[in-house]
Amino acid sequence: MANADLDLYARPQKRIRINRRRWINLLDLGEGGPTVVLCGGDRSTTLIWARVQSELARDFRVVAYDRAGLGFSDPGAFPRTTRRIVGDLRAALRAAGIEPPYVLVGASNGGFETRWFARHHPDEVTGMVLVDTTADDWTLRQQAAAPSWRPAWRNYLNQLRYVADCARSGSLRPGLAEYAQYVPQPMAQLPEALNDRRRDEALTPGYWRTHISECEAIEAASAAGGVDTRALLGDLPLVVLSAGVRIAPPLPNDEVRAFLATLEAGQEALVALSTLGVRHCIADSGHNIQIDRPEAVIAAVTEVVAMTGTRAS
């Protein structure tokens, strides 16, 4: 896709009114069913799918959107729980006249969104792709494997609150250590307009408030785990994509090994959510597979659509 075409992700696409006060930004491309719905991870907007959506749209109708408080969507009610996020998405799809069934694609924490959607609205979902996401009980897993992880996580959230304060005061600028650490740096795979948009959005306090709330909500939900999730999605066609290149948080060396082993176990747990679950490790990709290896995500969606013909009636 030419950079001129990718630049459309740097501006509002189609703002959909979901109630009397709020609008959700949505990008709808292509034709053909089932409709593919793309759900990004932390701080992600439609532009994280810029290298995937147009290619998928050659064969399917493909929808990407900005969650409330991010991109060109209006803020939503707090806290930003997965339930509220899915409610916004379903309202936007209905208001835009985009009917199910859907193949849901969730990247990173967007996987919590897609799984919640499928569990509570199974008749609307015909397949799922999870792109380097984590298990529902990841908080419990990491706490058990790496005791230093929880204090490191709390410190991370406190740092984000400070960054939000800097954004509010206008001091989040080049030269500040937190600017270099937390404001998205340019991605070589994206054109200048998209990298500029990613940077500019991160200078707004609402961006950080939304991100912090989403992190806290997912942490709280995953800490309440303990539910046997095996085959929880039944025979839903499911492909799990796992990054082959991992970066661990700052932990003691012995805990880093345990942390990474727990991530690996979590990937296998995701596969077990469906009796039709399969997994592919993308050896040369980091966490953002949709940016590093977009063809892997495209192939996974095609695989899931092919699997839909194997479901029990």
Over which residues does each language-model region extend?
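Active-site loop/oxyanion-hole signature of alpha/beta-hydrolase fold enzymes
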Residues: 27, 64-105, 109, 121, ...
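Conserved catalytic-core motifs of eukaryotic protein kinase domains, centered on the activation segment
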Residues: 48-50, 73-79, 140-141
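Catalytic active-site module of serine/aspartate enzymes centered on a nucleophile-bearing elbow/loop
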Residues: 274-313
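Flexible "cap/lid" subdomain of the alpha/beta-hydrolase fold that forms the substrate-access gate
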Residues: 129-269
